[in-house]
């Protein structure tokens, strides 16, 4: 459960950052795929 929660928080932060950088483009639905270690 903690992994899902952490992933959700990371996705949320990614979406917020994306909106600030690229406000005219919708963020990817699976940002975790681009943030894999």
Swiss-Prot record:
It is found in: Mitochondrion; Mitochondrion inner membrane. Keywords: ATP synthesis, Hydrogen ion transport, Ion transport, Membrane, Mitochondrion, Mitochondrion inner membrane, Transport. One of its GO terms (cellular component) is mitochondrial inner membrane. One of its GO terms (biological process) is ATP biosynthetic process. Belongs to the ATPase delta chain family. Mitochondrial membrane ATP synthase (F(1)F(0) ATP synthase or Complex V) produces ATP from ADP in the presence of a proton gradient across the membrane which is generated by electron transport complexes of the respiratory chain. F-type ATPases consist of two structural domains, F(1) - containing the extramembraneous catalytic core and F(0) - containing the membrane proton channel, linked together by a central stalk and a peripheral stalk. During catalysis, ATP synthesis in the catalytic domain of F(1) is coupled via a rotary mechanism of the central stalk subunits to proton translocation. F-type ATPases have 2 components, CF(1) - the catalytic core - and CF(0) - the membrane proton channel. CF(1) has five subunits: alpha(3), beta(3), gamma(1), delta(1), epsilon(1). CF(0) has three main subunits: a, b and c. This is ATP synthase subunit O, mitochondrial. It comes from Solanum tuberosum.
């Amino acid at each position: 459960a903690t992994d899902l929660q952490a992933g959700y928080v990371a996705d949320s932060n990614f979406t917020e950052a994306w909106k600030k950088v690229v406000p005219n483009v919708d963020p990817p639905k699976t940002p975790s795929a681009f943030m894999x270690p």
